[in-house]
């Protein structure tokens, strides 16, 4: 009889792992402590809740996360099914209605006869049986302690932040204009133009605004890919102009000129009744967010549906603990997945859950676990988190820097080179799937 598998945590990674197990006919006990016990970042008990942005970043094969998405589609990913079904306009990126997305994943998993849902907290590592731990960077204290004991090393951490969401009907449409950068795709973003004087006033107010107190917070522990806007602004007067307020490619159609700075708003739900402020992750006090962000042209009367907030994320010393199959080195049958392993980002977390779920299924079926080719985005992430020097281990997004370069004559055009790497990765994935997985 095939062994049942326990999956702890129904976030992006745990949901994907449960799906990969169930579609292979494996019975799954899926545990999720929410909504009975909430985390500092979550707001519901739904599966795969998106706690930060609603964007899953680029859909292009010239971008590593675009390659990762396509690989996951080829592997019948539940998270990619949901994202494609619930997308909202975002130019060349893939953004979703966060509530519809989470509902899609929840409905799919609760409808599967192979998956039994348990609304309860797990406070210890199961002593036996095949298990996937995917409790995320906000793992409850009791379980986090047990994981740390298992690791035999102190877990690492960084601080992550979310951007505010504002009501669409509170945006001054006479001031903002609709456009995607360089006119890629449809005009999907609302753009708030700033003059130099407006930018200088805003940047000065931002740097001097009062932040919320967070125990143990230090700027050095901020993840670069999700840096609070006020931390970025403090690095230099013009830093924001090369980051989230970059005006290049966003000419204002009202006068044909490129503003000095531009704040972008991205649609947050299918009804287009909410927008998030792109790149404005923050840990300012709520009152300060209202005061400072209402200085942005077009947002003078903005109504905040959700204020930005920050939380501490914990991750494992994976190079010392895991194999590239996401299985623990010292305990066969115990897998870890998601941001807690050191992959960073929604899609990356789901991707790790996909690999862990496939390998947990193989273990349950009496088959050998597999490691995905390092020429794929899925394989390169697993390779990175398990082979990097543990002393310098940091969370990492999908990146072409993790994937071996092309052989032969170097392609000078970066976009073309990246597309060729993606073509090779997808071909290698297809061959790997046919040889190793289609059995």
UniProtKB/Swiss-Prot annotation:
Record keywords, A-Z: Cytoplasm, FAD, Flavoprotein, Methyltransferase, NAD, NADP, Transferase, tRNA processing
Pfam families assigned to the protein according to its UniProt record, in alphabetical order: GIDA
GO cellular component: cytosol
Subcellular location: Cytoplasm
GO biological process: tRNA methylation; tRNA wobble uridine modification
SUPFAM superfamilies according to UniProt: FAD/NAD(P)-binding domain (SSF51905)
Listed GO MF terms: flavin adenine dinucleotide binding; tRNA (uracil(54)-C5)-methyltransferase activity, 5,10-methylenetetrahydrofolate-dependent
Catalytic activity: uridine(54) in tRNA + (6R)-5,10-methylene-5,6,7,8-tetrahydrofolate + NADH + H(+) = 5-methyluridine(54) in tRNA + (6S)-5,6,7,8-tetrahydrofolate + NAD(+); uridine(54) in tRNA + (6R)-5,10-methylene-5,6,7,8-tetrahydrofolate + NADPH + H(+) = 5-methyluridine(54) in tRNA + (6S)-5,6,7,8-tetrahydrofolate + NADP(+)
Family: Belongs to the MnmG family. TrmFO subfamily.
NCBIfam families, per database record: gid_trmFO, PRK05335.1
Protein name: Methylenetetrahydrofolate--tRNA-(uracil-5-)-methyltransferase TrmFO
Annotated gene: trmFO
